[in-house]
């Protein structure tokens, strides 16, 4: 991640959550050939290249459309969330529906997929009201647009002051598929009109 990406992530974290940027990948410089290939060799190489591309064609992982957490009775469709004009992460517009941070990782891909949900509303408990009740080993099921599903297992649940949001743990790339569920928690600041902390669930994909 570039220095600019780190600065952007740190700034956005103050609003609740942060965005992530793609990690750069360096490609080695090709070595010069020892001699010029013959036409037969070139044709053979071209055929091999065509075969390589045909077998390695990229199929993107379908987007998530639903989250189910049986142990705390959560069953919600997923709104797609992006970034607000000030480049902070959008929060779900509906208190009873969770949202997936679409510029980030798709559940099932290597990296940290992030799903947000409100803890309560003026009407009462919201979609992630019971998030703190999750325990290590609980299942989180994600259904994708093509009808496939992937299951994650809760590893830990933490609470952080919003001014100390763990950007690295939530958004930075991981080698394996992981999932983060985020809601508000802690003490409610009546003057500011929001909670002082975030509750974050860390989960890994079940193989």
Label each PLM-derived region with a short phrase:
Residues 1-26:
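Secretory targeting and sorting signals
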Residues 21-135, 141-148, 156-207:
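Solvent-exposed, non-transmembrane regions of membrane-associated and secreted proteins
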């Amino acid at each position: 991640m570039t220095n600019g990406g780190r600065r952007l992530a740190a700034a956005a974290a103050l609003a609740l959550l942060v965005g992530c940027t793609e990690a750069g990948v360096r490609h080695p410089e090709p070595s010069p050939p020892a001699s010029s290939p013959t036409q037969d060799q070139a044709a053979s190489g071209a055929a091999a290249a065509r075969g390589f591309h045909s077998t390695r064609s990229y199929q993107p992982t379908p987007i998530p459309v639903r989250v189910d957490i049986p142990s705390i009775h959560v069953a919600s469709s997923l709104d797609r969330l992006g970034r607000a004009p000030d480049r902070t992460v959008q929060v779900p517009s509906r208190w009873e529906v969770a949202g997936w941070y679409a510029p980030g990782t798709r559940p099932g891909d290597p990296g940290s997929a992030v799903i947000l949900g409100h803890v309560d509303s003026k009407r009462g408990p919201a979609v992630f009201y019971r998030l703190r009740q999750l325990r290590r080993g609980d299942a989180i099921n994600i259904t994708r647009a093509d009808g496939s599903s992937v299951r994650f297992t809760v590893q830990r649940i933490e609470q952080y002051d919003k001014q100390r949001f763990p950007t690295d743990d939530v958004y930075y790339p991981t080698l394996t598929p992981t999932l983060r569920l985020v809601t508000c928690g802690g003490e409610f600041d009546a003057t500011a009109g929001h909670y002082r902390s975030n509750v974050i669930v860390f989960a890994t994909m079940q193989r």
